[in-house]
Amino acid sequence: MTADGVEQLRKPEEKMQICSFLWVYYGFPTSCYEGRNVEEVRFTSGLKMGQNDDSEVDCACGIPDSGVGMALGYAEGKGVPYHRAISKYTPTWPRSFMPNSQKERNHVAKMKMVPVHDLIEGKRLLFVDDSIVRGTQLGETVRFLYEKIGRAHV
């Protein structure tokens, strides 16, 4: 691309290959890729997990944001309620996979998730999270639940 115009160096391939990362993790819920809505794919994935899981749980919870759609599907498939046991506070925190050091990533993961203690204590919770980049958010959330709340089964 120059000020004089655009030149195509190579034609695109006939067959597209799209990254599934868009549906599971990075895609915005209203986006569609190859005719499939992101939120629908997440919900359906969770639904199938719930239908096939024999764990005994009191409720399903999603780790915001991309885990929520899957957790809603899981809850429906399993026949258990969905509880918003973790709220996300993001005005000052980036995505937890973005900082350069693991120490910073752990700090971001810990600070941006706020638990609702009354929905967690003494419950058998099933959390759904994508955690496909580094697993930092899920690891920090589970560690927090065990260390600070103590009476949750995760």
Q: For the regions a protein language model found, what residue spans apply to each?
A:
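PRPP-associated nucleotide enzymes
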Residues: 1-151
